[in-house]
């Protein structure tokens, strides 16, 4: 149960997939209300997200008015966490995606940024190499989407 702000960048193919998954999942939880989805430009996502969230906090000053921020990648999550920290809104949780170093450090430090999903680049490369190897030896390659396992990073396992 709660209210969520989504920070997105739908022009990016990878980010749009995350946003579509978020859209599908949030529909399954009628007690979670999406307050707004805000487009974050790719050029300065930390600063832009910080400004966006600061403005949303001003417009929604009550403690229960915003309970979470979904950021479709880590840089806006970092900006959101900074805005929340400056506003003294420790109760709002932030999540991101990518597992970048700054985000993991903020998670370890116990900020509002509580989780990120770390991409498995080695696993992705393994899938690509396996498919190329099959192609080169004349075997049938897999069709459709393939997924490498990803890791949820929280304060308990952040390194």
What label would you give each PLM region?
Residues 1-159:
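A residue-level marker of the well-folded mature domains of exported/periplasmic proteins
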């Amino acid at each position: 149960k709660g209210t969520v702000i989504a920070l997105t960048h739908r022009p990016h193919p990878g980010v749009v997939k995350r946003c579509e998954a978020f859209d599908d999942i949030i529909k399954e939880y009628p007690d979670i209300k999406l307050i707004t989805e805000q487009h974050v430009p790719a050029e300065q996502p930390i600063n832009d997200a910080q400004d966006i969230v600061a403005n949303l906090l001003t417009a929604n000053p009550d403690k229960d008015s915003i309970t979470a921020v979904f950021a479709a990648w880590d840089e806006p999550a970092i900006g959101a966490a900074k805005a929340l920290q400056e506003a003294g809104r420790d109760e709002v949780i932030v999540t991101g995606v990518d597992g970048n170093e700054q985000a993991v450090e903020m998670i370890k430090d116990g900020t509002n940024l509580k989780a990120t999903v770390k991409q498995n680049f080695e696993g992705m490369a393994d899938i690509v190499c396996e498919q190329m190897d099959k192609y080169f030896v004349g075997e049938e390659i897999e069709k459709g989407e393939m997924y490498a396992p990803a890791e949820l990073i929280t304060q308990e396992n952040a390194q």
